[in-house]
């Protein structure tokens, strides 16, 4: 169950980062304060909840194991950047993502 909490904390953290990115997109396009405040508010809510979940994880998992698992954030953000904003990702970047996933699998299998 704690591993699901860790994954959910990671996803919420990423959602917060994506909301921040979306706020900057609105700022560049039409400078509507209402939209910027909405996206930044969502970012704060996601990041705040992620922090609470992260504290629960740290109560149950050694920090030396838990913290590297947050590398999942790089994977989620890369996938979202490609899907949502059609950002280009180089082969080198994808190789890095593969190494991150491999590292997470190795660390996760030792627990």
UniProtKB/Swiss-Prot annotation:
Keywords: Cell inner membrane, Cell membrane, Lipid A biosynthesis, Lipid biosynthesis, Lipid metabolism, Lipopolysaccharide biosynthesis, Membrane, Transmembrane, Transmembrane helix, Transport. Residues 40-109 form the EamA domain. One of its GO terms (molecular function) is carbohydrate derivative transmembrane transporter activity. GO terms for cellular component: plasma membrane. Heterodimer of ArnE and ArnF. Translocates 4-amino-4-deoxy-L-arabinose-phosphoundecaprenol (alpha-L-Ara4N-phosphoundecaprenol) from the cytoplasmic to the periplasmic side of the inner membrane. This is Probable 4-amino-4-deoxy-L-arabinose-phosphoundecaprenol flippase subunit ArnE. It comes from Escherichia coli O45:K1 (strain S88 / ExPEC). The lineage of its organism: Bacteria, Pseudomonadati, Pseudomonadota, Gammaproteobacteria, Enterobacterales. The gene is arnE.
């Amino acid at each position: 169950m704690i591993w699901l909490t860790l994954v959910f904390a990671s996803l919420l953290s990423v959602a917060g980062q994506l909301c921040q990115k979306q706020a900057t997109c609105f700022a560049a396009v039409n400078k509507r304060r209402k939209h910027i405040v909405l996206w930044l508010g969502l970012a704060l809510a996601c990041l705040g909840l992620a922090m609470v979940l992260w504290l629960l994880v740290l109560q149950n998992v050694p920090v030396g194991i838990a913290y590297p698992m947050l590398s999942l954030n790089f994977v989620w953000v890369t996938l979202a950047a490609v899907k949502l904003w059609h950002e280009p990702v180089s082969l080198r970047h994808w190789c890095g993502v593969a190494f991150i996933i491999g590292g997470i699998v190795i660390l996760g299998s030792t627990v």
